[in-house]
Amino acid sequence: MQNDKIKEYWEGEAGIYSEGIKAELKSETAENWKNLILEYAPEKEHLEVLDVGCGPGFFEIMLGKEGHHVTGIDITENMIHEAKENVKAAGLSADLMTMDCHNLNFPDETFDMIICRNITWTLDDPQKAYKEWLRVLKKGGRLLVSDACWYLHLYDEEKKKIYEAHDAAMWEKYGRGIHAHEDA
């Protein structure tokens, strides 16, 4: 089962990934994400948001600062631990729990918005997951999914240079490359 491999990998990566997220929260990227999300968010002063695959709490912190209530779920306990620490350090609160996004423990039509960043490629059954997400989304709510092609550096020389520079920086800072998984 793919989820077992994914879970094992990200349990081990939680601390390093959290450091990257903390840096990202201080960058222009965070402001760009916030603007993009709020552009597509339902027009409500206080949104109930579900962050699927929340990792170390990027959206919980960003949207929490805007006055929205964010519930974050992740399949890995270590990511939830990092998210709790990061949200607390930011002086915010969020509901954070370990949960498989294919089987959500929420009533129908719970959330105004569901956001998901960079997990679709890890799902065992994307159709089942999307169906489940839509079940807990309120009528008129928004589902925002962002994923990436992580292997452009294999096909594009310019992307390869960027990837190699970032990988070298990771080696210098952490003593290892971008990904520590043997298949990456």
PLM features: residue spans?
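Conserved class I S-adenosyl-L-methionine
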Residues: 1-44, 58-62, 82, 142-181
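Class I SAM-dependent methyltransferase SAM/SAH-binding core
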Residues: 50-103
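Short N-terminal helix/helix-N-cap motif within the alpha/beta-hydrolase-1
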Residues: 78, 123-128, 153
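Short alpha-helix
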Residues: 184
